[in-house]
């Protein structure tokens, strides 16, 4: 058995914008805040993607999706995750579990926790996903996610 651990982290600033939405784990969330990001700014999928890349020793998402590349403007983060999953598939690695923590102050995670979990299970095929939430004391105009992934293979 070959066991791999990957860790990922992402954060984005928020600015006030009435009747806006952010994406968390591929789920659109209505809010009065807007993410400042080049892609769709999904901190959950970005942290997960980096953790997946870590399991394969493939670097980080910035190596594959340059933030200065205009073709990545508004990019759906599911595209990023799917690219990372294809890299991992070459190593025949399979998920054991995904454990992540979302840090946010004004965006309430609890009402959408199970929707995020379900989305991640569907996107990754992993049936052991844990989503935790913590409030940010400061800065309040930021959202972040930390993610740890455990994978294994019998090669």
Swiss-Prot record:
Pfam family membership, one: YgbB
Pathway it works in: Isoprenoid biosynthesis; isopentenyl diphosphate biosynthesis via DXP pathway; isopentenyl diphosphate from 1-deoxy-D-xylulose 5-phosphate: step 4/6
Record note on cofactor: Binds 1 divalent metal cation per subunit.
Lineage top rank: taxon: Bacteria
EC number: 4.6.1.12
Necessary cofactors: a divalent metal cation
Keyword list, A-Z: Isoprene biosynthesis, Lyase, Metal-binding
InterPro entries in the cross-refs: MECDP_synthase (IPR003526), MECDP_synthase_CS (IPR020555), MECDP_synthase_sf (IPR036571)
Transmembrane regions: none
UniProt: 4-CDP-2-C-methyl-D-erythritol 2-phosphate binding residues: 10-12, 60-62, 65-69, 140
Known catalytic reactions: 4-CDP-2-C-methyl-D-erythritol 2-phosphate = 2-C-methyl-D-erythritol 2,4-cyclic diphosphate + CMP
Site (Transition state stabilizer): 38, 135
PANTHER family: 2-C-METHYL-D-ERYTHRITOL 2,4-CYCLODIPHOSPHATE SYNTHASE, CHLOROPLASTIC
Subunit structure: Homotrimer.
Job description of the protein: Involved in the biosynthesis of isopentenyl diphosphate (IPP) and dimethylallyl diphosphate (DMAPP), two major building blocks of isoprenoid compounds. Catalyzes the conversion of 4-diphosphocytidyl-2-C-methyl-D-erythritol 2-phosphate (CDP-ME2P) to 2-C-methyl-D-erythritol 2,4-cyclodiphosphate (ME-CPP) with a corresponding release of cytidine 5-monophosphate (CMP).
Family to which the UniProt record says this protein belongs: Belongs to the IspF family.
Protein name: 2-C-methyl-D-erythritol 2,4-cyclodiphosphate synthase
Organism of provenance: Mycoplasmoides gallisepticum (strain R(low / passage 15 / clone 2))
Gene transcribed to yield this protein: ispF
